[in-house]
Amino acid sequence: MTQLTVKALSDEIGTPVDRLIEQLADAGMKKASSDNVTDEEKQKLLSHLKKEHGDKSGDAEPTRLTLQRKTRSTLSVNAGGGKSKNVQVEVRKKRTYVKRSTIEDEAKREAEEVAKREAEEAAKRVAEETAKREAEEAAKREAEDAVKREAEEKAKREAEEKAKRDADTNAQRNAEEKAKRDAEEKIKQEAARKEADELKRRQEEEAKRKAEEESQRKLEEARELAEKNKERWSAAEEKKGDMEDTDYHVTTSQYAREAEDEADRKEEAGRRNKKKKKPSTKDEQARNSGRSQRGGKGGRKGKLAKPTSMQHGFDKSATVAKQDVVIGETIVLSELANKMSVKATEVIKVMMKMGAMATINQVIDQETAQLVAEEMGHKVVLRKENELEEAVLSDRDTNAESVPRAPVVTIMGHVDHGKTSTLDYIRRTHVASGEAGGITQHIGAYHVETENGMITFLDTPGHAAFTAMRARGAQATDIVVLVVAADDGVMPQTVEAIQHAKAAGVPLIVAVNKIDKEDANPDNVKNELAQYDVIPEEWGGENMFVHISAKQGTNIDGLLEAILLQSEVLELTAVKEGMASGVVVESRLDKGRGPVATVLVQSGTLHKGDIVLCGQEYGRVRAMRDELGQEITEAGPSIPVEILGLSGVPASGDEATVVRDERKAREVANYRAGKFREVKLARQQKSKLENMFSNMTAGEVAELNVVLKADVQGSVEAIADSLLKLSTDEVKVNIVGSGVGGITETDVVLAEASNAIILGFNVRADASARRAVEAAAVDLRYYSIIYQLIDEVKQAMGGMLAPEFKQEIIGLAEVRDVFKSPKLGAIAGCMVTEGLIKRNNPIRVLRDNVVIYEGELESLRRFKDDVQEVKNGYECGIGVKNYNDVRVGDQIEVFEIVEIQRTLD
C-alpha cells in the first residue's frame, strides 16, 4: 500500500497544501501537512470531489452494461503441395445490456416533452386568437371614441364660437353703454364743477361787498361821531394841548382801524383759498360726505376729517428747467447729461433720433454736444480748452519797438557735398572732423560776426534719415543756402532740400562747391537745378548762384555778401526788449546737467532765471551757454543758446516762450501733455478697425523688436523713422521703447521682456545696465554713424525672412528600353543626354514634353552595379519609386531643390 504525506500529495496533483487540507476536511478527514494519506482516503477524497462537482457516477448504479467476449481457435488450412498450415482464428463479441427502467424513463420523458410542446402550442394559439380579438375590439372602440370625440369637439367649438360672439356683442354693447355713461357723468361733473365755481365766486364777491359796506358804514359812523363831539374835543384840546390832540386821533381812528383790520383778514382768507389746488370731483364728494357724517353727534362738529387720499398736494413741474450748459472741446456723454440735469438715457435717445449712436461713457465733440443740448432746449456756452494757454501766452510784455536783426541761414544739401566744411571755413574752426564718419548728425546752430554784420547759421544733416531735421531747419530760417557739389550735381537730398525751402517760403541761395576739382562742372549743376525751378539770376531767375571751394576758401566772402544782400532785401526785424520767444532746434539728456535744449531766440531777450514754456515741458533757466560752451546771461534775437533747467526733454521744433508765472506754466504743460495723450489714444482707437484685417495676419509676420537710445531728440526721431520705413510685408520693425540719454537697467529689462535688441546711438550703458545685459544675454550694439546702424538692422531683418527655394535641373535622360525586375518592377534603360543623373534625387517623368509623374529616383545602375551618379553620354538603368508605367521614348528629368538666401530690397 502506497502512502504519501499531504504535502507530497499536494505537490503531485498541483494543489496548494492549505486548499488540499480544506478539501480533506470537507471529505471528513482532518489531516495536517505532515500526515500520511492512504489509498482508501484518496478514493474517498476523489468521490467527495466528484459529488461536489456534480459527477455522481462514482457511487451510482450503472444503467448500461457492456460485455466483451473473445474466443481463440486453430484452423488447419491446405497450403498446397500436400502441405497444410495452421491459422489462429480469434472471434470477438460485444454485447450491451441496458436497464429496462432507463428505457422507460426516457420514453416517459419524451412523451412528457411532446405533451408539453403540444400544450404550449395550443396555449400560444389561444393567446394569439385572444390578442387578435382584443385588438379588433380595441380598434373598434377607438374608432367609436374618435367619432364621439370629433362630434363633441365640433359641438364644443360651435358653443365656444357662439359664446365668443355673444361675449363680443355684450362687451361691445357694455363698452358703448359705459362710454355713454362716462360721457354723461363727465358732462354732469363738469356742469357741477362750473356751478360750484360760479357759486363760490358769487359768495366771494358778496363777502367782499359786505366787508366794504361794513367798513364804509363804520367809517361814516366814526365821522358822524367826530362831528358830534367836535365842540367837546375842541375844549379838551385847549386844556391838554398836543397830548390831547394825539389822544383824539387815537380815539377817533379806533373804529376805522377795526373795520380796516376785519376787511384785511377777509381779503387774506380769500387769497389763501385761491392759492389752494382745486380738488377733484371725487375728493370734493368725499369731503362733503365727511362733513355730513361729522355733524351727527355732539362734541365732534368742527373737527377735520381724516383724508381719504394719501397723495400729496405737490405737483412736479412738467416743463424742463433751462440750463446754461458749458461745453468744452470734448465732453463725456454722462457729464453732458449731468450738466443738463437729465438722465443719460434721455441724451442717448435724442442722439438716436438725430441719427447718431453713442454710449454713456463715449466722448463726443463740441459740435455734436451743442446740437444735442440745443435740441433739448438748453442754452449752450462754448468754452475753449486752451483758454488758460491763450491767457498765459497773451500775458507777455512784447510791446517794445522792432529793430533790425541778424538773418538766420540754414545750410542744406546732399550728404558729403561740403555743408559743414563751408561753415567751418566761415567760423575758422574744424567742426567737421569732430562729427562721426565725417557727416553731420545734429542741427548745429552757430552765429558768426562778419565785417558787415552778424549771421546765424544752422547746419542740417544731409543723410536721408534726417528729413524731419531739415524740415525744422527750413521752418526756423530766413534764408536757405543750398550747397551742391560741382562734380556730383543734383542728388536726392538736394531735391528734398529744394522742396523744404519752397514749402517754408524762404529764398534760396545756391553755393556750387568743389569748383577746384578737375571734374567740376558748374554749368551742369545750373541745368539740373533749372529742372526744379531753381533759375540763376543771369538766366532771368530769382536765385543767386555763388561758386565756392570750402577746402580752399575760394569766394567764401562772396557767399557772405550774397547772404547779407538777401537779408537787406527781406528787411528782417524783431523786438529786442521784452519777454523772449523762440524755437527748440535740438534737445538732449545730459547725464550731469539733465535736459538740455538748443533754442534759437526769434524775438525778445532771453535772460538767465526766466520761466520758459517749451511744448509739454517747462522750467526756470538755470544756466545758458553759447555754441562755444561759454556761460552767458542773456541772448537776443537770432542768437542760438543752450538752456538748462527744463522739467524734461522737449521735442525738437517746439515753440519756446517766456511766461510770468511758473504755476500757470506747469498747468499749461500738463494740459498739453494730456491733450497729446488723448490724441494719441484716439488715433490708436481709430486705427483698430482700419487695421483689423492686417492684424489678422500679424501672427504670420516676423517682428524685430528694438529699444532705441540716442544722444539727442532729433537723432531718435530720424533713426526711428528710418527703421520703421524698413518694415516689409514679411518682417516688421517694432520700436518698443526709445529715448534720449544713456542706456539704463530699465531699458535692459524692457528689452528682455519684449525679446528686443538694444541700439545705442552715441550713448553707452552704465555699469548696472552692463551687468543686466550680461545676465539677460540681451543683444546690445553701439553706433556712431547712422547708415551703419540702418545697414545692420537691414541685415538682421534679412536673416528673419522665410527662406526661398528654387528647383534647379541637373540632368536629363531618355528612355531607350524597359526591363522588368522582380524586385523593383519596371526598369528604364536610359541614355543620359544632358547634365548628370544622381541617385535619390527628385525626378519628373515627361511624355511628349508633358509631366506625367513626379517622384524620386530609387535605383540607379550601370552594368548591374549600383552607382551614385551617371554622367552625360553614358547608359544606365533607372528605377522610379512607386511608378511602373515607364515607356520607351519618355524623358526622365532630375532636379535639385536649392535654397536661395533672401535679402531686403
Curated annotation (Swiss-Prot):
The keyword Signal is assigned to this record: no
Region (G3): 459-462
One Pfam family from the record: GTP_EFTU_D2
Ranges annotated as biased composition (Basic and acidic residues): 30-44, 52-62, 101-248
G4: region residues: 513-516
Domain of life: Bacteria
Disulfide bridge partners, by residue number: none
Residues in tr-type G domain copies: 404-573
Function in brief: One of the essential components for the initiation of protein synthesis. Protects formylmethionyl-tRNA from spontaneous hydrolysis and promotes its binding to the 30S ribosomal subunits. Also involved in the hydrolysis of GTP during the formation of the 70S ribosomal complex.
Family: Belongs to the TRAFAC class translation factor GTPase superfamily. Classic translation factor GTPase family. IF-2 subfamily.
Protein name, as recorded: Translation initiation factor IF-2
Annotated organism of origin: Vibrio parahaemolyticus serotype O3:K6 (strain RIMD 2210633)
